[in-house]
Amino acid sequence: MVVKKSRGSSQQLPGLGGQGGCTGFVGMLGTALLFISLPWGAQVMASANISTALGHTSGHYLSIGDGSVTEFDFPEKSEGIIVISSQYTGQTNGTGPSPILKVISLDTEVLTIKNVSAITWSSGGGFVVGIHSGLAGLAPLHLQLMDFYEAPPLLIEERRDFCIRVSPAEDLPSALNTNLGHFSENPILYLLLPLIFVNKCSFGCKVELEVLKELLQSPQPMLLGLLGQFLVMPFYAFLMAKVFMLPKALALGLIITCSSPGGGGSYLFSLLLGGDVTLAISMTFISTVAATGFLPLSSAIYSYLLSIHETLHVPISKILGTLLFIAIPIAAGVVIKSKLPKFSELLLQVIKPFSFILLLGGLFLAYHMGVFILVGVRLPIVLVGFTVPLVGLLVGYSLAICLKLPVAQRRTVSIEVGVQNSLLALAMLQLSLRRLQADYASQAPFIVALSGTSEMLALVIGQFIYSILFPVP
């Protein structure tokens, strides 16, 4: 049984009152002890409807409830208890020394264990485990029933099948403070989705097939971009997650961000910084299509290496679905330009006035997102997010220098690796994870997007000033 502390009227605890197999004065005393252990003398039970009757235990000494349930819901940022029954001989009849129960939470960001106390009642014994929940997520439990009176200590039983699912509150503090609904519920978002789809289709109409053919014949820039985007940058995210010991949700957000394809206006920055614009558009198209394979793969690999998969479900299928939502209209645009060039030109003309609407809507949603996502942001992820675009720019330029590419292509490769589609990463996280987990993980792409835009604008301004001070004759 899992019980939460709260103020208010008390509720009957199944299994420790008159209905759960505990009778008489000793049973009432057991119930009283549980109430004393919780301030205010009031409890709210978790959503699982279970009993602490010592019945079905599937051949185990330890059980929670009747043994038929192994996953229990618990609210976020709360304190409470877990009642674990024990049928170990000696503890149930009080004739032998009491064993000791060790309880370990395998994700302390989601759930921490405060204390473990042994209890007895007329029909058996068990343990009361004090818990404190943090972020929403799944916290597996590791139970070890030990007999320390033996030499060496005897491991009586070990269980790893129980877990506590910490669920987010219905109303987040940030939403209550700002009187705003969550940005994912904003109708503007749903109004912009068709425009985003058409905009991506029009982007595909800008891809020059001749440039794509040239890239296939001389694939050095394309290969360097793919190498930087899907090998070097995800590995950098992995290193930063290790060095700064980022929480698992943040680590996942950073991995997905650094595994994202080029985008975020990279071809515009190529134009402003003297890069090869047609190459930039083609590289963005190729990396977006390639991301449908590479991004889920790198997310799965690094999630395993960082043990994220143990406590946080990484929804690879949803990530892939979000990528396809972007890749399919871009590919459709390429086909339209090839087969229907006049319609392609018309589409480009039609989307131009709506681009301004997309820009305004994007700025509004970005502000609205920041209200939720940046609540409680900490320094480590800010520092890491600030370095990601800079490292990408340096990696891309260094790789291009190694192959002695022309200056314009060097700048394009550098920008394609450094300016990743962080907003795509943010969308994948928001559509794939539960709300609180998604908002927490989204701190990484949001900060990377802010940092990347600021740093690229600084480069544009710097080059503009340089061109004025040192004009080319």
Swiss-Prot record:
Highest taxon of the lineage: Eukaryota
Name of this chain's protein: P3 protein
Alphabetized GO MF terms: symporter activity
Record keywords: Membrane, Symport, Transmembrane, Transmembrane helix, Transport
Localization per Swiss-Prot or TrEMBL: Membrane
Gene3D superfamilies reported for this sequence: 1.20.1530.20
Pfam family, one: NTCP5_P3_N
Keyword Transmembrane: yes
Any GO BP annotation: response to retinoic acid
Protein family membership: Belongs to the bile acid:sodium symporter (BASS) (TC 2.A.28) family.
Membrane topology: Multi-pass membrane protein
Record's function text: The ubiquitous expression and the conservation of the sequence in distant animal species suggest that the gene codes for a protein with housekeeping functions.
Residues passing through the membrane, by range: 25-45, 221-241, 249-269, 277-297, 316-336, 356-376, 381-401, 413-433, 446-466
Gene Ontology CC terms, in alphabetical order: membrane
